[in-house]
């Protein structure tokens, strides 16, 4: 099998969990995966992790003892499907010098540190944060403020329409960018002007397309959207490619492939995210096309 390998300075995305609300299980869910949200983003060698759902455990197993000494995990919000992988993140159990930094918007005025401490405590979990070999640091912010890291990296943030609030993120590297827009419900005025401005021109938008258009009629107000609204936003904001994400756990491979075909007839650069799929963009100052693994090459185990 021949495929393009991204350079060491590419902006690279890898999906470790693509489901929403709960995991999916069974042979009919193999192609698109079973885990809840977790996305690895590499800016060259610099690692960022978006959300810490059950897919974080698989990412942690892959990183193992080679994980960086500092790991930044950006949480869109604290609903359980976005943090359930934290207690099982292998790098937190290895290496006493490692620092794991979590970032979450103070969406309802409360720091995320208190809920995370409740998660890492009996009766929910037998080990407290303070007892882990790695050291956890939490950084709160208000959605809309940029996050600026000690190495100069910068991540923009945006408040999303979701019960209790959620944060969208935009990260750039060498003229390329990715927007992570998980857990958002479209508004009556759509595309939302503020969100359209936030994602405008990005190379890849990862978007909450949990429900079909027919399902949404029964799920209005739950805080999620559809692939159709993702396409409308992408096309209205000059987004170059679209990954539909936060997939409903009841949608099996056959139904998702049918939806993907329908979507690609409207927007050929859109696709439904698959677990362990890799999308890479070379620096914009190079004459190299975006290196994306086609879905057939992005099955579980490919890396």
Please provide the spans of the model-predicted regions.
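Active-site flanking residues adjacent to catalytic metal/cofactor-binding acidic residues
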Residues: 50, 76, 181-182, 207-209, ...
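Cap/insert and terminal regions of metallo-dependent hydrolase folds
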Residues: 187-276
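Binuclear metal-dependent hydrolase catalytic cores
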Residues: 1-179, 190, 195, 253-299
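ATP-dependent carboxylate-amine ligase
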Residues: 302-303
